[in-house]
């Protein structure tokens, strides 16, 4: 698996997320969002820590309204853990490193 966070758009969502073999953490963010700047290092950490069993992508909300609407993102930063068409879990707002790792471990250790 590749390490690191992949930047995607509405047009790439199906191929990068819905057709991925492993679960995908989708990080919804905005360039104007201060709290998103706090979350970015944690998203990178998750991508590197779980690279063997998780794909991590980020999607900027303003230029990608279709996916934002489909996944009912009401605020940023927001996370959706997706496997195929199924949302395994979601959260909105800044979360701590421990909460992020627990959020991921809950699902990835059961797969």
Curated annotation (Swiss-Prot):
The keyword RNA-binding does not apply. Residues 2-109 form the Thioredoxin domain. InterPro entries: Thioredoxin, Thioredoxin-like_sf, Thioredoxin_CS, Thioredoxin_domain. Disulfide bonds join 33-36. GO terms for biological process: cell redox homeostasis. GO terms for molecular function: protein-disulfide reductase activity. It holds the Pfam family Thioredoxin. Keywords: Disulfide bond, Electron transport, Redox-active center, Transport. Belongs to the thioredoxin family. This is Thioredoxin 2. It comes from Nostoc sp. (strain PCC 7120 / SAG 25.82 / UTEX 2576). The lineage of its organism: Bacteria, Bacillati, Cyanobacteriota, Cyanophyceae, Nostocales. The gene is trxB.
């Amino acid at each position: 698996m590749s390490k690191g966070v992949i930047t995607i758009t509405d047009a790439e969502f199906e191929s990068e997320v819905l057709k991925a073999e492993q679960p995908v953490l989708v990080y919804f963010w905005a360039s104007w969002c201060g709290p998103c700047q706090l979350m970015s290092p944690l998203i990178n950490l998750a991508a590197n820590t779980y690279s063997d069993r998780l794909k991590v992508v980020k999607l900027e909300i303003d230029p990608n309204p279709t996916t934002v609407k489909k996944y009912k993102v009401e605020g940023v930063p927001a996370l959706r853990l997706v496997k195929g068409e199924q949302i395994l879990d979601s959260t909105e707002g800044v979360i701590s490193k421990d909460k992020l790792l627990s959020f991921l471990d809950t699902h990835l250790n059961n797969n």
